[in-house]
Amino acid sequence: MGTLAHWREYLGLVESPFNGMTFDCGVTREMGEDPVAVCRWLGERDRINHVHFRNVVVRKPYVDYTEVFLDDGQVDLFGVMKELVRQKYPRTIYPEHPRAIDVDRERGIKNQYPGGGGFAAEIYNVAYTRAMLQAALTR
């Protein structure tokens, strides 16, 4: 399941919206794909069961990438959000893997992955995602 070709093969096994997948913006970019185009392809087939909304900087697909703040990476998250709105996507958008911010560090809050943030970072991610949704809805 590590390539877009594998995703397409898997989703072609059973032609049903119940045969869907989690669309992860970051993983899609880590594979070297265009998250907006992949979102469009999956969404037009009603195959997105859940969205993981995160951003990355990729230096070498599959091998060398860094997770970054939602507003600071190579994924066109606003483009993805506009595509989800265009599709009238009705399910969950989860802004995952918050990055560490000062207030979390000062409180000693740590997460299970390198550079991961805590409560304030989660709030930042949710607020940023919600604002992006509102902006996409007004366009």
Segments (PLM) and residue ranges:
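Histidine-acidic metal/acid-base catalytic patches
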Residues: M1-R139
